[in-house]
């Protein structure tokens, strides 16, 4: 028993060293550097606007984060999607969502799916101030906004059509449907559910986050007295299904703050963020005694274990102004930091490299992988997707990036069969009849025929 205790102690001491290559370093901000303003992505103008308000004195955190959102929603300095009505849903509707949280008393106000009102963050502020609710949505949110004095506006139809028409002419690709007919990869609908026996194994299509084309931004302000506010603003995912609510409006998904411990901003695939509430998880990790760096990495690893294809980032700030970040699926995750020391202001764009999702999930590729290299159609009752499968065996220690470059370039899709009964089933079928294989019969085929990055199930 004594030996086991020593081994456990040794492993605990060595764990930070073993994880050092993946860790994201914390950036301590001395007390004299407070107040502190952090915003996601590299939108320096919006951060500057928020910082101008924050540095006016204590208890300006709420107005500071609101000012940052106002700058984004009233200009194109935070990208076309946020300021230019360029993120319609699949029916051409333009809606906004926003949220605001007070770290002193946990008051929260948010709106989602709100059309015709530009000042989404202002309406969210009114929900926080004038109601006992936390979230209003849809047409009712717009009516509430008008009752609070916000003017209804007509969005630019030409700007929306410039985005929507090419998408419609391209058979509505990409979209957010799956397991429907007609096939979502080749049609704009109207869709209906596929019979249960024809539905494919669940697999997400992740859309890349392009620099300067972000549909969500978050702001977090901390003053010298320890007051925290966080706010978020989003135009929603482009070509989303009408009625969809995003992470920017959901408590703990995009933003969270608690004066007692700190706050967090999360951004990326909103549908994944809403399932895990990473901003809340990060703040609770701080409460449990973790540093911002370890909290950010732990939360990101948790997301990746369940959604290996996730793209996004997370910034975590302690109540003392120490901050760190973690990300996945991006070349680099950037955020803007402003602070003050001895009357002198500083502002910088921070950039971090993301975790290697392959190593986070599996420690590197090994075992049997099946690369779908060709798709053909065969008739029989109903059309059936036949996929030609190439068997590839990797030994332990093969570098994941080398594997991608050598085997996966220009492939239509890739899948990894988990160890277990289904994997054995696939192996036996391949041994008996290598070549064409009806993967859908085993429930292993991805949705047709989107292109996928290298994905671990």
Swiss-Prot record:
Disulfide bond annotation, renumbered to this chain: 72-78, 172-188, 327-354
Gene3D superfamilies: (Glycosyl)asparaginase
Superkingdom of the source species: Eukaryota
GO cellular component: lysosome
Pfam family, one: Asparaginase_2
CDD domains given in the database record: Glycosylasparaginase
Annotated GO MF terms: N4-(beta-N-acetylglucosaminyl)-L-asparaginase activity
Keywords assigned: Disulfide bond, Signal
Signal sequence bounds: 1-20
Family per similarity comment: Belongs to the Ntn-hydrolase family.
Protein name: L-asparaginase-like protein GL17509
Species, as recorded: Drosophila persimilis (Fruit fly)
């Amino acid at each position: 028993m004594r030996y086991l205790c020593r081994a456990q102690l040794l492993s605990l001491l060595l764990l930070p060293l073993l994880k050092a290559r993946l860790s994201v370093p914390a950036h301590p901000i001395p007390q004299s550097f407070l107040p502190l303003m952090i915003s996601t992505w590299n939108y320096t103008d919006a951060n500057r606007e928020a910082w101008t308000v924050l540095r006016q004195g204590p208890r300006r955190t709420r107005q500071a984060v609101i000012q940052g959102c106002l700058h984004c929603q009233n200009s194109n300095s935070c990208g076309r999607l946020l300021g230019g009505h360029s993120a319609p849903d699949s029916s051409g509707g333009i809606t906004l969502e926003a949220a605001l949280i007070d770290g002193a008393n946990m008051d929260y106000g948010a709106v989602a799916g709100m059309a015709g009102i530009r000042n989404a963050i202002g309406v969210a502020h009114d929900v926080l101030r004038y109601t006992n609710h936390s979230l209003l949505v849809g047409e009712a949110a717009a009516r509430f906004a008008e009752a609070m004095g916000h003017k209804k506006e007509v969005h630019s139809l030409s700007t929306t059509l410039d985005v929507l028409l090419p998408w419609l002419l391209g058979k509505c690709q990409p979209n957010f449907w799956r397991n429907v007919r007609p096939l979502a990869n080749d049609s704009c609908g109207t869709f209906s559910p596929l019979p249960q026996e024809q539905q494919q194994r669940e697999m997400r299509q992740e859309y890349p986050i392009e620099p300067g084309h972000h549909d969500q931004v978050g702001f977090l302000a901390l003053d010298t007295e320890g007051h925290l506010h966080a706010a978020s603003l989003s135009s929603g995912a482009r070509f989303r299904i009408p009625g969809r609510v995003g992470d920017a409006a959901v408590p703990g998904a995009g933003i969270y703050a608690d004066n007692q411990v700190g706050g967090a901003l999360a951004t990326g695939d909103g549908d994944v963020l809403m399932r895990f509430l990473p901003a809340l998880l990060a703040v609770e990790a701080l409460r449990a005694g973790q540093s911002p760096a370890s909290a950010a990495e732990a939360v990101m690893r948790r997301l990746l274990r369940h959604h290996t294809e996730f793209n996004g980032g997370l910034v975590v700030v302690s109540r003392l102004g120490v901050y760190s970040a973690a990300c996945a699926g991006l070349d680099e995750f950037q955020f803007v930091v402003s602070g003050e020391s001895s009357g002198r202001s500083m502002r910088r764009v921070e950039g971090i490299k993301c975790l290697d999702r392959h190593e986070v999930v599996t420690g590197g590729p090994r075992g049997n992988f099946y690369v779908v290299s060709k798709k053909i159609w065969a008739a029989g009752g109903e059309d059936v997707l036949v996929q030609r499968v190439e068997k590839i065996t990797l030994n332990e220690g093969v570098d994941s990036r080398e594997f991608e470059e050598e085997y996966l370039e220009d492939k239509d899709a890739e899948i990894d069969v988990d160890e277990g009964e289904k994997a054995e089933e696939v192996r036996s079928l391949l041994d008996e009849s290598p070549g064409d294989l009806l993967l859908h019969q085993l429930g292993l085929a991805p949705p047709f025929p989107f292109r996928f990055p290298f994905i671990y199930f």
